[in-house]
Curated annotation (Swiss-Prot):
GO terms for molecular function: ATP binding; magnesium ion binding; pyridoxal kinase activity. This is Pyridoxal kinase PdxY. Belongs to the pyridoxine kinase family. PdxY subfamily. Substrate binds at S9, T44, Q45, D225. HAMAP family: PdxY (MF_01639). Pathway: Cofactor metabolism; pyridoxal 5'-phosphate salvage; pyridoxal 5'-phosphate from pyridoxal: step 1/1. The gene is pdxY. It catalyses: pyridoxal + ATP = pyridoxal 5'-phosphate + ADP + H(+). InterPro entries: PM/HMP-P_kinase-1, PyrdxlKinase, Pyridoxal_kinase_PdxY, Ribokinase-like. Homodimer.
Length: 289
C-alpha cells in the first residue's frame, strides 16, 4: 500500500481540494494523510458566498513535524499539493517535501499549481504565483497545470498545441519529470472535447473526453483536484504514465457524466466510485510529439 500526504484545501460541503481527491485515492487503495491549507464551508463559486479560514502560519510544518516524530515521513511515498492560502504555506510544503525525500529518497512530489482558470483568470495572490514559479518547480517531480497556470510557469503566451508542447518541454528542462496539462482550453484541437496533454522524456500524448454542457453558472468545481489525485494514485499503483493518463481521463469522464446526468453542481464521486478502479477506457492517448 502506498502512502500519500495530500496538502490542499478542504470544503465541509461538496468536492474541492482534499474533498475531491482524498476519497478517490483511498478508493484506489492508497493510504492518504490529508492536511488542509484552508477550511471553507463550501467552494468559492457559490453566489451566496462561503465561510471559513486559511490555516495559520506554521500549521503545515507543525503537523509534518508530528509525522516525523512518529517516523511516518520515512514511509511516505508521495506528496500531493494543491490550493494554497498563502505563499508561506508553499514554503512549508517545500520544506516538508525535502524532509520526506531525505527520509525516503524514493518519494515523489506531485504539484498541482492551483492559480485559477483559463476562462476566469488568476485567483491567487501574486506571491503565490511567484512561489510556484520560483520554488515549487525546483522541487516537483510531476506538475499538473491548466493552460493559465502553464503560461504563468513558463512566461509564454500559449494558443496552440505546439506551444503547449514547447512549454511542457521547457518545464522538463528545469527538472520536472512529468507534466500533465489538465485542460488545454483554447490551445486544444477539438473544441467540442475536454482535452489534456501528458509530456515526459518519451514525448507528448493527447487525450480527450466529452465536454458536457453544464449551465455556465453551475459549472462543477474540483475537476482539476480530482484529476491530480486520480493520476497520482494510478501512478502509485504501478501504471505507466500513459496507462495512468488514459485511466484518469476515463475515470474523470465517468464522474463528469454522472454529475451532468444528475443535474448536480457538486462532483458525484460516491455515485461514480466503481470507475476509479475499473475505468472504461474508450479514448486512447495519441502521441503528438
Amino acid at each position: 500500500m502506498k502512502r500519500i500526504l495530500s496538502i490542499q484545501s478542504h470544503v465541509v460541503f461538496g468536492c474541492a481540494g482534499n474533498s475531491a481527491a482524498v476519497f478517490p485515492m483511498r478508493r484506489m487503495g492508497m493510504e492518504v494523510w490529508p492536511i488542509n491549507t484552508v477550511q471553507f464551508s463550501n467552494h468559492t463559486q457559490y453566489q451566496q458566498g462561503w465561510k471559513g479560514i486559511a490555516m495559520p502560519a506554521g500549521h503545515i510544518s507543525e503537523l509534518v513535524d508530528g509525522l516525523s516524530a512518529i517516523e511516518a515521513t520515512q514511509v511516505c511515498d508521495a506528496v500531493l499539493s494543491g490550493y494554497l492560502g498563502s505563499a508561506a504555506q508553499g514554503q512549508e510544503i517545500v520544506t516538508a517535501v525535502n524532509k520526506i525525500k531525505q527520509d525516503n529518497p524514493n518519494a515523489i512530489y506531485f504539484c498541482d499549481p492551483v492559480m485559477g482558470h483559463p476562462e476566469k483568470g488568476c485567483i491567487v495572490a501574486p506571491e503565490v504565483e511567484t512561489f510556484f514559479k520560483e520554488s515549487a518547480l525546483s522541487s516537483a517531480d510531476i506538475i499538473a497545470p491548466n493552460l493559465l497556470e502553464l503560461e504563468s510557469l513558463t512566461g509564454m503566451t500559449i494558443n496552440t498545441l505546439d506551444q503547449v508542447i514547447e512549454a511542457n518541454n521547457q518545464l522538463l528542462e528545469k527538472g520536472v519529470k512529468m507534466v500533465v496539462v489538465k485542460h488545454l482550453s483554447r490551445a486544444g484541437i477539438q473544441k467540442d472535447r475536454f482535452e489534456m496533454l501528458l509530456t515526459t522524456e518519451d514525448g507528448s500524448y493527447h487525450v480527450s473526453r466529452p465536454l458536457y454542457d453544464f449551465d455556465a453558472k453551475r459549472q462543477p468545481v474540483g475537476a482539476g483536484d480530482l484529476i491530480s489525485g486520480v493520476m497520482l494514485a494510478n501512478l502509485m499503483a504501478g501504471y505507466s504514465p500513459i496507462d495512468a493518463f488514459e485511466r484518469t481521463n476515463a475515470a474523470v469522464d465517468s464522474v463528469m457524466q454522472e454529475t451532468f446526468n444528475r443535474g448536480a453542481y457538486e462532483l458525484q464521486l460516491i455515485a461514480s466510485q466503481e470507475r476509479f478502479n475499473a475505468p472504461e477506457i474508450i479514448v486512447k492517448a495519441e502521441k503528438v510529439a
